[in-house]
Structures are given as C-alpha cells and as structure tokens.
C-alpha cells in the first residue's frame, strides 16, 4: 500500500494535570492512543510511526509491535514533531496520513475516505475539516473568494473576524511524501506560542503553487480532542454509550445505560441482563443467560453461562456455569469456581479452586484452598492461611461438611466425606469420612444467672 501514517503523541498535556502522558490516559478501558493506532491499522495502513516526547518510554511500550517510535526530545510544536518522523519514512514515495494522538473517536472508514479523496483531488496536501456547533479551541480554515484553502489560523492567533469562521482544522492531514519534509524545514515560529505549527505548511504550499484540498467530515464528534479531564469524561461517556448500544444490538439487556459502565474490551453473551451500577472492565467475558448486578464490579473475569452476580466484586477470577455469587461477595485474583457453585453474602475467596456443586453460603474466608465437589462450608468458616511469613494451603475433599465457625489452620487437609464440628479449630489432617471436633466441653451451672443478679442488689 502507498500509505503511511504518523501519529503525533509527544505532548505532555499540561491541562490534564497528570504525571501520565496525555495519550496514555484510559478511555473506556484502553489508552486513547490505542484507538488511533487501531483505526489506522484497520484502514489497511501497515507503516505507522508514533512521535513520542513526554513519557516516551511508556508510549513506546504501549505501541510495541504495532508502530515505530520517533522521539521528539524537546516539544517545539506539531511541525517539529512531524519532522522527527522523517528518518522513518526515508525513501517512502507514497502518501502520509498525519493524526493527533488525542482523538480516540476517529474511525478507520473516515481515514480511508480521506486518503481516497486526496488521491482523486490530486493535491499535495488534503486537510480533514469539520463544522462543529462550537468551534472554540480549534484552528480555523481560511479560504479565498473562490473557496480554495489558503491558510489555517490557530485560535490563539486568530482575529475576531477569523474566530467567527465555523470550519475548523481537525489536525488530521494527508500529504504527498515527496517534498513534505523539505517543506517542514521551511516553517518558522512566527506565532504567539513560539512553536513550529504544522498548520503553517498550508501557506508554504499555496505560495509554491501546490494544491491544498479539504475533505469535510460529516460527523464532527469523530475528531473530538481531549485536552483536560472534562473532555476525557465527555469522550468516555460517548464511547461507553456506543459500547452499550453494540451490546444491546447483539442481544444483551442493559436496564439503564446511563448507570452501566462497560469497557470496549468486554464481551457479553446474548440474553444476559445487566443491572444498574455495574462495572465490567478489562478483558472480562460474560456468558449467555447471566444476571449481572446491580452494584457489581468485574475486572478481567471469565464468567460462564447462567451465572448470577449480585452486589459483588470479581477480580481476575473464573466462574463456571450456573453459579450464584453474592450479594456482597468478593472473589479475588486466581479464584476458579466449577459449575453450580454458590458463594453467598459476605464471603471472600482468594486464590482458591472450588469444585462443582460446592457451597460457601455466608460470612466465610477461603484463601489458598482447594475445595472438592459437593462440599458445604458452614457460616463463619475461616481458612487460617497466613502465619505471619508464609501463605499455606488448605485442601478439602469431595463431599466434606465443614461446620459453622470452623477455623482451618493451614497447612491442613480435610478428607473426602469428612465432617468438622461447629466451632472447631482444626490443626491436624482429618481422614476421609471422619468427624473432627475440637472445642471446650460445655459447662452448665444451674441458677447461676439469678444468683449473679442478686449479688448486684
């Protein structure tokens, strides 16, 4: 293909007031830069150069294997940034798309249309322009009396009359590679900011008699830039709505989209119902016929079919088919549940395997444990897995019955079909089918309470 792309991602984004490079702030679960890289790749462009500056090492890690990285050591403006990509495009004679790294809503189809229009127009440069309802903050496209583009004026340098123009420069261009980098070297910082503006290349081309075309975008939302946290929230809201609409179109019921938050990387099966105030994040996968929420958060979780998760938190865990979770359960990383497992209210499970049909109904902690199939873990059971230095395992065999308020002091094994008496502290292994009881014998003193009251009188 005769297309290459350069993504300008060197700015710090001072208005974000963050230590993190602006382009790495997450939108709907992914760094905003990843949206632009993916859109470029989806448009069929294989040669991609990302120009990084502030936080360049972090940016490079994000695009590793997807793009080459050019370094802009000193942030001297967009023209200077594009110039840093020159060595990576040495000998390239095709067309160069130039994009900003802070416009995550841009779509691959728009980039393909821009490139196609540029070819048809036979121009040296083509601008992607738009007419938003509020053009404030954007550079204005200046045309002559015949409608030809003659220059772009940044808003900070625009006159009052120029600020009334609604057509804006989106910061996305298509250039002929031939002559581009020579023209960039001719740009001077003759503006209020003392920076080398890429927009000045339009006047250079016009003075040289080279054609500059403009392709107007139908949906200005695509080029919404993110410069501060407020704009980040606006784009997040827009993208989340789009994600939820896609889910609903695929057969998922979202009871209240306004209070449901699903990352773009999440997959949900049909006939699943998502209740309000549910957060599905990261690489979470939800099966079919599930009920998720209300008030639940799942992060990088894998959930089977027919599962209920109510008012619970599930982090990096796997849940088998037909399980019931919650309310108010907490599944911590590396937890794996088999089929038909019940994890009830106020139960915390960490780094444990729970077998098919087992139940942990309420008020229990299970950590570093392997629990077999058909096990019942009574209310208030605790696996005492930490001795102050090390975490120790607990193993419970198939069909075991753990009485309420049992303390299992790890390392310890409970055999298949074994039973522990309520209130026991188990420190030794229990054989298959055995009963283990460890508690003080009950003492009964008749009439003790009345005598105690009489003494107080």
Curated annotation (Swiss-Prot):
Any signal peptide, and if so, which residues? Answer: none
The protein's superkingdom reads: Bacteria
Location(s) in or outside the cell: Cytoplasm
Q: What GO terms describe the biological role, i.e. biological process, of this protein?
A: cell morphogenesis; cell wall organization; lipid A biosynthetic process; peptidoglycan biosynthetic process; regulation of cell shape; UDP-N-acetylglucosamine biosynthetic process
Name the segments for region: Linker: 230-250
| Entry GO CC | cytoplasm; membrane
Gene3D superfamilies according to UniProt: Hexapeptide repeat proteins, Spore Coat Polysaccharide Biosynthesis Protein SpsA, Chain A
Provide the residue positions that the database annotates as binding Mg(2+). 102, 227
Q: Write down the chemical reaction(s) this protein catalyses.
A: alpha-D-glucosamine 1-phosphate + acetyl-CoA = N-acetyl-alpha-D-glucosamine 1-phosphate + CoA + H(+); N-acetyl-alpha-D-glucosamine 1-phosphate + UTP + H(+) = UDP-N-acetyl-alpha-D-glucosamine + diphosphate
Q: Where is the active site?
A: 362
Q: Which residues bind UDP-N-acetyl-alpha-D-glucosamine?
A: 8-11, 22, 72, 77-78, 139, 154, 169, 227, 332, 350, 365, 376
Q: Where is this region: Pyrophosphorylase?
A: 1-229
- What cofactor requirement does the entry state? Mg(2+)
Q: Keyword Coiled coil: yes or no?
A: no
Annotated residues for binding of acetyl-CoA? 385-386, 404, 422, 439
Entry note: cofactor = Binds 1 Mg(2+) ion per subunit.
This molecule's function is given as: Catalyzes the last two sequential reactions in the de novo biosynthetic pathway for UDP-N-acetylglucosamine (UDP-GlcNAc). The C-terminal domain catalyzes the transfer of acetyl group from acetyl coenzyme A to glucosamine-1-phosphate (GlcN-1-P) to produce N-acetylglucosamine-1-phosphate (GlcNAc-1-P), which is converted into UDP-GlcNAc by the transfer of uridine 5-monophosphate (from uridine 5-triphosphate), a reaction catalyzed by the N-terminal domain.
Q: Which family does it belong to?
A: In the N-terminal section; belongs to the N-acetylglucosamine-1-phosphate uridyltransferase family.
Q: How does it assemble?
A: Homotrimer.
Write down what this protein is called: Bifunctional protein GlmU
> Which species is this record about?
Pelotomaculum thermopropionicum (strain DSM 13744 / JCM 10971 / SI)
The record's gene field reads glmU
């Amino acid at each position: 293909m005769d297309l290459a792309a350069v993504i300008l991602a060197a700015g710090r984004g001072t208005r974000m007031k963050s230590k993190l490079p602006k382009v790495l702030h997450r939108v709907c679960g992914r760094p905003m830069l990843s949206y632009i890289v993916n859109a470029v790749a989806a448009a069929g462009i294989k040669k991609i150069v990302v120009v990084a500056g502030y936080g360049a090492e972090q940016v490079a890690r994000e695009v590793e294997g997807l793009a080459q990285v050019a370094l802009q050591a000193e942030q001297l403006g967009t023209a200077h940034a594009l110039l840093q990509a020159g060595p990576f495009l040495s000998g390239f004679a095709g067309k160069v798309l130039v994009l900003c790294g802070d416009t995550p809503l841009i779509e691959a189809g728009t980039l393909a249309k821009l490139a196609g229009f540029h070819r048809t127009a036979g121009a040296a440069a083509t601008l992607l322009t738009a007419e938003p309802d509020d053009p404030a903050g954007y550079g204005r496209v200046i045309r002559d009396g015949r409608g030809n583009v003659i220059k772009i004026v940044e808003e900070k340098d625009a006159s009052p009359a120029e600020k009334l123009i609604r057509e804006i420069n989106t910061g996305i261009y298509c250039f002929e590679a031939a002559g581009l980098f020579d023209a960039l070297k001719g740009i001077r910082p003759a503006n209020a900011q003392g920076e080398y503006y890429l927009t000045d290349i339009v006047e250079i081309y016009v003075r040289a008699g080279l054609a500059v075309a403009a392709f107007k975008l139908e949906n200005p939302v695509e080029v919404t830039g993110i410069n501060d946290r407020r704009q980040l929230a606006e784009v997040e809201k827009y993208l989340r709505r789009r994600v939820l609409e896609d889910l609903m179109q695929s057969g998922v019921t979202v009871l209240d989209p306004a209070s449901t938050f699903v990352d773009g990387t999440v997959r949900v099966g049909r006939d699943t119902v998502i209740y309000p105030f549910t957060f599905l994040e990261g690489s979470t996968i939800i099966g079919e016929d599930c009920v998720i929420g209300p008030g639940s958060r799942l992060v990088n979780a894998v959930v089977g079919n027919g599962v209920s998760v109510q008012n619970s938190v599930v982090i990096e865990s796997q849940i088998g088919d037909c399980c019931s979770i919650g309310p108010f359960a907490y599944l911590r990383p590396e937890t794996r549940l088999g089929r038909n497992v019940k994890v009830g209210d106020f139960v915390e499970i960490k780094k444990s395997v729970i077998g098919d049909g087992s139940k942990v109904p309420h008020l229990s902690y299970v950590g570093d444990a392997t629990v077999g199939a058909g096990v019942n873990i009574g209310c208030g059971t605790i696996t005492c897995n930490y001795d102050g230095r090390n975490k120790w395992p607990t193993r419970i065999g198939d069909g075991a019955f753990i009485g309420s308020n049992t303390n299992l002091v790890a390392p310890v094994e409970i055999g298949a079909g074994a039973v522990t008496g309520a209130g026991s502290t188990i420190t030794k292994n229990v054989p298959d089918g055995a009963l283990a009881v460890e508690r003080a014998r009950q003492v009964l003193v008749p009439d003790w309470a009345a005598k105690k009251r009489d003494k107080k009188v």
